[in-house]
């Protein structure tokens, strides 16, 4: 759907077909973009595909459709809710004292005081060095959509926001990074919230190894220096992430929000208290989850208490045992009154899980759109009734953009093998089979023979049934047995012929391993640094130029010669 009728629709079509030309003196390449439906990739869940197609089975689980009218409706709802804009601006201004702040960011922060300014939010944990490519993609999607809405709805202002989930304690997930297929893992003795951990020698050793890999590229030195300026020994991971994202996107006016903040969390004390002592969120979300589970796999189930206790080097669950509230796997415990006092005096010591994090985000931000991945959208679809219970506006949900980046060498192999954009999502075996079948001079299919044999068996069955009707089943069994033998013969014929196509097999394996590392989507494995090292700032520009807004399609970007 277009943003403002036919003119905007035409704009989006032209955007989809455009070529993004690299202007760097050191690069003469250009890039082409192709879009295919998410369903054709085979990498997205049923709930995501159904959400994109506005399937009836999901329409009761979200508030607004992902289109321009949905944005307008979300704005109307948001205006009825009292966001503490003054507090938000104060905390952002305080936060940005730690980094160099662009004029555009300063302007956007100030604009948040205005009741007609709204945020376009995306969120992620502070994975080391940003983790996976989609970290970058979701941020650029938020920036692009905010820019588009500022053009199409000039009566309002839209500001892109990146919400850092710095309280996540899953170091195994957040502490790994892949560079050109090589996995690096951060081994540290630190525990608790990853955002509060500090850059140490072990992490800097990883960065040194990555430097050795990337410094040979045209922009390798530039991207390594960019990361090194932020990941300084002794700095927290949260602040390092903030620094890097700010350096990459400050010129786009992206606001980075660090929600691990005492004053912002005070806004949530009533909800946190409700969760701990009445278990209201758990009851509401459980009901919704049961309804959703009738059609889909549920992404996240609530606990009785959906808060962690966050202090020093721990982030552990709060568990009620009769009249005592214990912090799991520690010796810390509270009575009800003691825990109430702790929450009132130290709200920063209470960390929401995935169920309450969304409420916190939408309470402190004047937000109208949340951009997330498939997993994020799946759990947001469990939360609509929870939002309604607390009278917090539920945003428009938009699936983040997805990309597959194909460098010049791999693109050359794809063209050599005459593969289409859809072909590259097929398995190695299927691709090899198609190439062999298409190029062989021999007959590998026994379809005609099977048809002839089938006719013989049908006639035989008629004949034998005239003698004894029970023999018909025996003929069927013989036919099935023979057809299985013929199927096996076809497999052997194909296998024998494949030997003549060893070169093409190697090329296909090279293509697949490059584009689908660990048999997964590139964006869910690889880091942004190798692509920045090769293409420089144009990497960001190419993604921005080919990012769609509401039009949900998977984008394949090819580097041309």
Language-model-detected regions and their locations in the chain:
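Short, conserved secondary-structure transition motifs
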Residues: 162-174, 266, 402-415
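A structural-propensity feature for long, helix-poor, extended segments
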Residues: 174-179, 406-435
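Low-complexity, highly charged intrinsically disordered N-terminal segments
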Residues: 44-99
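A glycine-rich helix N-cap at a beta->alpha junction
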Residues: 179-205
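Glycine-rich phosphate/pyrophosphate-binding loops
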Residues: 132-133, 146-170, 395
């Amino acid at each position: 759907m277009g943003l403002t009728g036919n003119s905007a629709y035409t704009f989006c079509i032209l955007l989809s077909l455009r070529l993004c030309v690299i202007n760097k003196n050191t690069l003469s390449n250009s890039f082409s973009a192709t879009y295919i439906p998410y369903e054709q990739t085979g990498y997205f869940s049923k709930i995501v595909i159904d959400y994109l197609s506005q399937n009836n089975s999901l329409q009761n689980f979200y508030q607004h459709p992902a289109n321009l009218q949905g944005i307008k409706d979300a704005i109307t709802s948001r205006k009825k809710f009292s966001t503490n804009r003054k507090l938000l601006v104060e905390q952002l201004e305080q936060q940005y004292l730690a980094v160099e702040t662009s004029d555009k960011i300063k302007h956007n922060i100030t604009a948040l005081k205005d009741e007609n300014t709204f945020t376009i939010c995306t969120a992620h944990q502070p994975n080391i060095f940003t983790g996976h490519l989609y970290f970058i993609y979701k941020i650029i999607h938020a920036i692009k959509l905010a820019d588009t809405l500022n053009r199409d709805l000039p009566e309002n202002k839209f500001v892109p926001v990146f919400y850092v989930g710095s309280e996540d304690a899953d170091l195994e997930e957040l502490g790994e990074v892949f560079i050109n297929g090589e996995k690096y893992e951060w081994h540290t003795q630190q525990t608790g919230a990853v955002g509060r951990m500090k850059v140490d020698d072990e992490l800097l050793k990883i960065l040194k190894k990555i430097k050795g890999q990337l410094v040979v590229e045209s922009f390798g030195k530039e991207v390594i220096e960019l990361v090194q300026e932020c990941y300084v020994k002794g700095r927290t991971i949260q602040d390092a992430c903030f620094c890097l994202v700010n350096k990459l996107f400050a010129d786009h006016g992206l606001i980075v929000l660090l929600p691990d903040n005492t004053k912002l969390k005070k806004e949530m004390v009533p909800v946190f208290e409700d969760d701990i002592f009445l278990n209201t969120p758990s009851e509401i979300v459980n009901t919704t989850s049961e309804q959703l589970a009738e059609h889909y796999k549920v992404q996240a189930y609530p606990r009785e208490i959906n808060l962690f206790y966050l202090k020093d080097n721990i982030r552990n669950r709060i568990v009620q045992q009769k009249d005592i509230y214990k912090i799991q796997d520690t010796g810390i415990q509270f009575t009800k009154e003691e825990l109430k006092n702790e929450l009132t005096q130290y709200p920063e010591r209470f960390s929401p899980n995935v169920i309450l994090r969304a409420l916190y985000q939408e309470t402190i931000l004047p937000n109208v759109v949340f951009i997330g991945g498939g997993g994020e959208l799946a759990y947001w679809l469990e939360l609509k009734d929870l939002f309604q219970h607390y009278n917090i506006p539920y945003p428009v949900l938009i699936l983040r953009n997805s990309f597959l980046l194909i460098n010049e060498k791999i693109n050359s192999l794809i063209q050599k093998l005459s593969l289409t954009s859809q072909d590259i999502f097929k398995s190695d075996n299927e691709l090899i089979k198609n190439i062999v079948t298409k190029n062989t001079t021999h007959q590998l299919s026994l379809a005609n023979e099977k048809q002839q044999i089938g006719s013989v068996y049908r006639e035989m069955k008629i004949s034998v049934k005239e003698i004894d009707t029970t023999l018909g089943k025996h003929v069927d069994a013989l036919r099935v047995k023979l057809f299985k033998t013929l199927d096996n013969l076809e497999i052997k014929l194909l296998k024998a012929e494949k030997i003549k196509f060893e070169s093409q097999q190697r090329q296909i394996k090279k293509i697949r391993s490059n584009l689908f590392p660990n048999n997964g989507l590139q964006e869910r494995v690889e880091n942004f640094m190798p692509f920045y090292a090769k293409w420089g700032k144009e990497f960001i520009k190419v993604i921005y130029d080919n990012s769609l807004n509401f039009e949900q399609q998977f984008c394949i970007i090819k580097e041309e010669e």
